[in-house]
C-alpha cells in the first residue's frame, strides 16, 4: 500500500507506509503521480509555535499571486497574501550618509487577504476546538486540501473540507472550495466570507533576514460589498502602486443562501446562512481576483478584477483545478525527479522543485525573490542566488521561467547603469545586490553593494540559459547587452598588478561568504569574473560572426571595440587565482589565511552567528558563513581533484553553514571528489532546509535558492551534470544514499531522462532531434529510437594526493617512520591516559591541549601537563608517568593487525619493494611490543630504543641514531611524522620530512599527505 508522505509529530518528512515492492527498477521510476512522495501531508493541527512554519510549507502561488497556507474558518488564521509586483517603498535613514549609499528600500507587503471564511453556529458560538486534522499539498495537481473536525463548546462536531488552488498562469486568482459537513450537529450555520486588509508584516527586530522595511502594510482606500461580491482598493503607504481585490461566490450544494453583506474600511464581504443535520453538507466556492498597476485608476482596477473573478467563477473550482493539474503535468513530464529507494528524500526533492516552479515570476518584470512569494522574509528582495541557483535549474526544467528572470535583469539594466554611476564607475552596469524594482535597496554596503560578484552571477545565468536553450533571439536582443555592460565593471575595480607578476587583481569587494567583507582578490569573485570576461569575449565573437548586421550595430551602440575586448581577454588570462604554497589551498582572499581561526568552543553553539556576533568580530577570524572557494569549484571549470580535495577539507573546517545555500555547494563538491557520505549528509541538509526549518526562519517564507540547490545537489552532484559547455556533460555515480535515481532535463528542445541504477546509466531521449552528450568523457549520440545504456562510473576515490612544498633530494635510500598517528591510532589511547592524569591533578585538558603532547616523550609530556595544574602536585613525577603508562597499556592491550591504519601495511611493503631500508622512530617505550602486536615488526630493519636517548623529539637525536643504524646519511632519508615536534626533529636532522595529517598543523613539513594510504613512494623516490 502506498500512502502520502507526511509530516510526523516530530516534524520530519516520512512515508506513512513503505513503498510497495516493484518487480523492476523501471516500475519504481514510473510510479504514478498519486504515489506517496507526491503529497506533503500533516495530521496535527498547527499551534502558535508552528502556525507560521506550516503556512509557509503549504503556500500556493503561480508566480504572480502567493497565498500562505492558513485556516480559512479560524479568526486570524487564513494567512498572508502577496503579489509579486506589489511593494512599498520607504526611505533609508543614516546617521552618516555618504555618496552612493542606497536611498530607499522596497518592501513586498501583504495585500488583501481573500481566504477568510469565519464560521459560527446557531448560538453564535465559534466552531470550538480541533479534534482531528489533516492537511495535504498535492505536488502533482498543484492544489491543497485541509480536513478539520471541530467540536463546539456544546459538544457538536462539524467537519470542514477546504480545498485551494492558485490555478491560472499569469493571473492573480485564488480559488477555494469550502465544504461544511455535520457529524452530529443540527442547526443553523453562518459563514462570514470576507476580504480583510492584509496584516502588517513581521517587524525586523534583531533579525536582519527580515529587512528594515518589514512591518510595513498597504493602506486601504475603499471597500464595498453587494450580495455575493465584494471589492477592496489599496495603495502603498509610500509607493504609487494600487491594487483591487474582488471576491465572488458560487453556492454549490446544501441549504445555504445569501443573508446579507457588510462593508467596513478594513473588512467587507458576504454573510451566508445555512442549516445542517447529521450527514448533511453545505458547499460553496469562492473566487478571489486581484488587479494592480502603478498609478492605476481605482475604478478600472476594480472592473478588471471583477471580470477576472466572474469569468473563472463560471468555470467552477473543479474545472479550474483540473486544468491547473494538466498544466503542471506538462512540467513534471519535463522535469520529474525520482529517488525510489529513499522516499523521504524523493518527496523533499519534488517538494522543493514544485515550490521553485510555482514561486518563479512569469512576466519578466519581477525577479525571483529569496523567499519567493511565500512570505515576507528578506522584504521580498531578489538577490544573486536567483541567478546562481534558481536559473541553472529552471533553464533545463522550465526555460521560460529562467528567461523571465533574465528579462527582469535586462529590463532593469538602465537602473543598474545608474547604480554604477552612483558607485563612481564611468561605464557599464552594476547589478544591485538586493532589489525589487531594480534599484539598490541594501543599507549595509559591506555586505551589499560590495558584492560585485553579482555581475558575474548574472552573466553565469545567461551563459547557462544560452547553452541549454540556444535562444539566440534572447542573446541578441537582451542577453548580449546584459553580459557586456556588466563585464565593463571588472576593469574599473581591478588592475594588472606588477607586484604580483602582472596578475589581474580585484580589490575592495565582498564575496558570497558574508562573514568576510571588503577584501582583495576574493577567490569566488575572481574566478567568476574570469568566466564572465571570457564569456563576454565569446559573445562579441558570436555577434560579429553570426549576426553580421545586428552584431556590429549593437557593439557600436554600446561602444565596445577591439581594444576593450582584448583587455578583457588579457584580464581573464591573468586573473589572480593563487594557491597557498604552505597549505596547498586556494586562499579565500588575500588575508583570510592570515587571520586567527574562529574559536568554536568559546563561541558556543548559538546559530546563526549573525544574530549573536558583531560583524567586525566575524571579519577578523577564519570563519565562513558559506565557503566562497567551495562554491566557485561547483560553478566553474574543473581543476585537479587533489586541489579540490584540499580546498574542501580546509574550508569544511571553518564553515558554519549559516547560509541556507552552503550545504548545496558542499554536497556537489563532495560528490565530485568522491566523498559520497558527506555528499549525502549535505544533500539532506539542503533538501530539508524548509521542511525541517533547519535555519529557524522558514516562518517568514521558503528558501528558493536552497530549494533549487537540493535539485543541483542530486543532479550536479550525483548526476555529474554540467551545462556550461555546448555539449551537456554527465558523470552519474551511485551510493548507498541514492542507489537509484532519475532526473529529466530539457536541452535545446529535447527532453532527456537520465536513470541510474545497478544496471548502469540509461539515457532516454523522450522527444526532439538527436542529441550528443558527454558521458564521463565518452561521446554518445542519443535518439528517440531506443534508450542508450552506459556504464555507471565509480565514485572517485578521495584525491588527497601529496602536497609537496619542497622537492626531495636524490637518492632516497631509507625511510624513518613514526608509529603513533602514522601506522596506527594510539593517539586516542594516549589522550585518554593523559586525561586521566590531568583529572587527577586538576589540570584543564582537552583534545586541543593534547596536540602539544603529540610526538613528545612521556616525561616531557608530563612536564607540559604539570604546567597546566593549578597548584603544586604532591605525587612524584615518575609515579605519575608510570600511572599514565599503565592506563595506556590497558587501553592498547587488545591491539592487533586490524588496528593498523588502512593502507599502512601496504605502504611498508611497497617501501621494501622499492629498496628502502626502514627504521621505526617512535618516542613510545612501548613501540616494539606494539608493532609486534600489529604484525609489522618484521618489516623494519631497525627500531630505535627511546630509553637510550638523551633527548626526545623535537631534538634530532632519534633520527640521527636511526640513519646511523641503517648506514645511510640523513640527507638520503625520508621521514614520516604526524606531529609538529616530529617534523621539526626531521628537519633539524636534515631528513626530508613528510607530514601525515593536516597541512595547516604540519606547516613546516616538506610535503604532506592526509593519511598513509595516500602515500605514493614513487612521488618521492624519483625515476
Q: Language-model segments: what does each one mean?
A:
Residues 3-378, 613-614, 797-802:
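Acidic/polar, glycine-enriched structural segments that form the non-catalytic walls/loops
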Residues 52-83, 389, 437-438, 515-543, ...:
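C-terminal capping/lid segments that line or modulate ligand- or cofactor-binding pockets
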Residues 103-153, 159, 641-645, 652, ...:
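Non-catalytic C-terminal accessory modules of carbohydrate-active enzymes
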Residues 360-374, 400-460, 466, 473-477, ...:
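Helix-terminus loop motifs that line ligand-binding clefts
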Residues 382-410, 477, 534, 538-541, ...:
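Active-site core of glycosidic bond-cleaving carbohydrate-active enzymes
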Residues 805-813, 909, 925-1023:
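Asp-based, Mg2+/Mn2+-dependent phosphohydrolase catalytic module
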Residues 808-851:
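Active-site neighborhood of HAD-like aspartate-dependent phosphohydrolases
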Residues 890-920:
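Short, acidic loop-to-helix structural element flanking the phosphoryl-transfer center
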Amino acid at each position: 500500500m502506498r500512502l502520502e508522505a507526511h509530516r510526523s509529530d516530530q516534524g520530519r518528512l516520512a512515508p506513512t507506509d513503505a513503498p510497495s515492492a516493484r518487480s523492476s527498477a523501471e516500475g519504481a521510476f514510473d510510479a504514478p503521480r498519486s504515489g506517496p512522495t507526491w503529497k506533503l501531508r500533516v495530521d496535527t493541527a498547527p499551534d502558535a509555535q508552528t502556525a507560521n512554519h506550516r503556512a509557509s510549507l503549504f503556500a500556493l502561488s503561480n508566480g504572480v499571486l502567493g497565498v500562505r497556507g492558513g485556516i480559512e474558518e479560524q479568526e486570524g488564521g487564513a494567512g498572508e497574501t502577496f503579489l509579486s509586483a506589489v511593494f512599498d517603498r520607504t526611505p533609508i535613514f543614516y546617521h552618516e550618509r555618504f555618496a552612493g549609499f542606497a536611498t530607499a528600500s522596497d518592501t513586498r507587503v501583504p495585500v488583501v487577504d481573500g481566504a477568510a471564511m469565519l464560521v459560527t453556529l446557531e448560538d453564535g458560538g465559534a466552531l470550538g476546538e480541533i479534534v482531528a486534522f489533516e492537511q495535504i499539498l498535492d505536488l502533482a495537481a498543484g492544489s491543497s486540501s485541509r480536513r478539520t473536525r471541530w467540536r463546539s463548546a456544546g459538544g457538536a462536531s462539524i467537519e470542514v473540507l477546504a480545498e485551494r488552488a492558485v490555478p491560472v498562469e499569469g493571473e492573480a486568482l485564488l480559488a477555494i472550495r469550502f465544504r461544511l459537513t455535520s457529524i452530529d450537529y443540527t442547526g443553523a450555520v453562518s459563514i462570514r466570507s470576507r476580504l480583510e486588509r492584509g496584516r502588517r508584516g513581521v517587524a525586523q527586530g534583531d533579525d536582519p533576514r527580515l529587512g528594515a522595511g518589514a512591518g510595513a502594510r498597504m493602506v486601504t482606500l475603499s471597500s464595498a460589498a453587494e450580495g455575493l461580491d465584494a471589492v477592496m482598493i489599496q495603495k502603498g503607504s509610500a509607493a504609487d502602486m494600487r491594487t483591487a481585490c474582488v471576491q465572488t461566490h458560487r453556492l454549490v450544494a446544501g441549504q445555504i443562501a445569501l443573508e446579507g453583506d457588510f462593508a467596513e474600511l478594513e473588512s467587507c464581504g458576504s454573510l451566508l446562512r445555512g442549516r445542517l443535520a447529521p450527514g448533511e453538507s453545505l458547499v460553496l466556492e469562492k473566487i478571489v481576483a486581484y488587479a494592480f498597476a502603478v498609478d492605476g485608476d481605482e475604478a478600472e482596477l476594480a472592473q478588471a478584477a471583477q471580470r477576472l473573478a466572474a469569468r473563472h467563477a463560471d468555470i467552477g473550482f473543479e474545472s479550474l483545478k483540473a486544468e491547473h493539474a494538466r498544466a503542471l503535468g506538462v512540467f513534471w513530464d519535463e522535469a520529474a525527479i525520482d529517488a525510489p529507494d529513499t522516499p523521504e528524500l524523493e518527496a523533499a526533492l519534488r517538494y522543493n522543485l514544485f515550490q521553485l516552479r510555482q514561486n518563479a515570476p512569469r512576466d519578466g518584470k519581477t525577479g525571483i525573490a529569496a523567499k519567493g512569494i511565500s512570505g515576507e522574509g528578506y522584504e521580498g528582495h531578489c538577490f544573486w542566488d536567483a541567478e546562481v541557483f534558481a536559473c541553472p535549474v529552471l533553464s533545463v526544467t522550465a526555460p521560460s521561467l529562467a528567461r523571465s528572470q533574465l528579462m527582469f535583469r535586462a529590463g532593469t539594466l538602465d537602473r543598474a547603469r545608474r547604480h554604477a554611476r552612483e558607485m563612481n564607475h564611468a561605464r557599464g552596469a552594476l547589478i544591485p545586490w538586493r532589489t525589487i524594482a531594480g534599484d539598490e535597496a541594501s543599507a549595509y554596503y559591506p555586505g551589499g553593494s560590495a558584492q560585485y560578484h553579482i555581475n558575474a552571477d548574472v552573466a553565469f545565468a545567461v551563459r547557462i540559459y544560452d547553452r541549454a536553450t540556444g535562444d539566440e533571439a534572447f542573446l541578441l536582443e537582451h542577453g548580449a547587452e546584459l553580459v557586456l555592460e556588466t563585464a565593463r565593471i571588472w576593469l574599473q575595480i581591478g588592475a594588472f598588478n606588477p607586484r604580483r607578476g602582472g596578475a589581474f587583481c580585484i580589490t575592495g569587494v565582498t564575496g558570497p561568504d558574508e562573514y568576510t567583507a571588503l577584501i582583495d582578490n576574493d577567490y569566488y569573485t575572481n574566478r567568476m569574473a574570469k568566466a564572465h570576461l571570457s564569456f563576454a569575449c565569446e559573445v562579441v565573437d558570436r555577434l560579429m560572426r553570426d549576426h553580421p548586421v545586428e552584431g556590429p550595430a549593437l557593439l557600436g551602440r554600446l561602444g565596445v571595440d577591439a581594444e576593450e575586448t582584448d583587455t578583457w581577454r588579457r584580464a581573464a588570462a591573468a586573473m589572480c587565482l593563487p594557491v597557498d604554497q604552505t597549505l596547498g589551498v586556494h586562499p579565500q582572499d588575500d588575508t583570510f589565511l592570515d587571520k586567527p581561526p574562529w574559536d568554536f568552543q568559546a563561541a558556543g553553539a548559538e546559530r546563526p552567528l549573525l544574530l549573536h556576533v558583531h560583524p567586525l568580530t566575524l571579519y577578523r577570524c577564519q570563519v565562513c558563513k558559506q565557503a566562497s572557494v567551495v562554491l566557485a569549484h561547483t560553478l566553474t571549470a574543473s581543476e585537479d581533484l587533489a586541489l579540490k580535495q584540499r580546498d574542501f577539507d580546509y574550508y569544511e573546517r571553518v564553515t558554519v553553514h549559516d547560509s541556507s545555500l552552503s550545504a548545496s555547494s558542499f554536497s556537489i563538491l563532495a560528490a565530485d571528489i568522491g566523498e559520497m557520505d558527506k555528499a549525502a549528509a549535505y544533500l539532506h541538509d539542503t533538501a530539508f532546509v524548509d521542511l525541517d526549518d533547519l535555519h529557524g526562519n522558514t516562518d517568514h517564507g521558503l528558501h528558493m535558492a536552497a530549494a533549487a540547490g537540493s535539485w543541483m545537489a542530486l543532479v550536479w552532484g550525483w548526476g555529474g551534470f554540467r551545462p556550461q559547455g555546448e555539449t551537456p556533460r554527465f558523470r552519474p555515480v551511485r551510493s548507498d544514499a541514492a542507489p537509484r535515481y532519475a532526473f529529466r532535463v530539457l536541452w535545446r528542445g529535447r527532453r532527456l531522462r537520465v536513470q541510474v541504477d545497478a544496471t548502469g546509466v540509461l539515457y532516454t531521449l523522450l522527444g526532439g532531434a538527436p542529441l550528443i552528450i558527454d558521458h564521463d568523457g565518452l561521446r554518445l549520440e542519443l535518439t528517440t529510437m531506443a534508450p542508450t545504456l552506459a556504464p555507471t562510473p565509480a565514485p572517485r576515490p578521495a584525491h588527497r594526493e601529496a602536497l609537496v612544498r619542497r622537492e626531495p633530494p636524490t637518492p632516497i635510500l631509507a625511510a624513518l617512520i613514526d608509529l603513533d598517528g602514522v601506522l596506527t591510532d594510539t593517539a586516542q589511547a594516549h589522550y585518554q591516559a593523559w586525561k586521566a592524569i590531568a583529572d587527577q591533578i586538576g589540570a584543564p585538558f582537552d583534545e586541543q591541549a593534547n596536540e602539544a603532547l603529540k610526538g613528545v616523550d612521556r616525561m616531557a609530556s608530563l612536564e607540559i601537563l604539570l604546567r597546566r595544574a593549578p597548584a603544586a602536585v604532591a605525587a612524584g613525577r615518575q609515579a605519575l608517568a608510570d600511572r599514565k603508562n599503565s592506563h595506556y597499556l590497558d587501553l592498547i592491550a587488545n591491539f592487533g593487525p586490524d588496528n593498523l591504519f588502512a593502507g599502512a601495511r601496504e605502504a611498508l611493503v611497497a617501501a621494501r619493494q622499492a629498496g628502502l631500508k626502514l627504521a621505526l622512530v617512535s618516542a613510545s617505550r612501548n613501540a616494539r611490543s606494539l608493532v609486534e602486536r600489529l604484525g609489522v615488526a618484521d618489516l623494519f630493519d631497525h627500531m630505535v630504543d627511546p630509553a637510550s636517548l638523551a633527548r626526545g623529539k623535537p631534538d634530532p637525536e632519534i633520527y640521527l641514531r636511526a640513519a646511523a643504524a641503517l648506514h645511510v646519511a640523513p640527507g638520503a632519508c625520508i621521514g614520516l611524522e604526524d606531529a609538529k615536534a616530529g617534523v621539526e626533529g626531521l628537519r633539524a636532522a636534515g631528513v626530508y620530512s613528510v607530514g601525515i595529517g593536516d597541512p595547516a598543523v604540519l606547516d613546516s613539513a616538506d610535503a604532506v599527505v592526509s593519511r598513509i594510504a595516500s602515500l605514493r613512494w614513487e612521488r618521492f623516490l624519483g625515476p
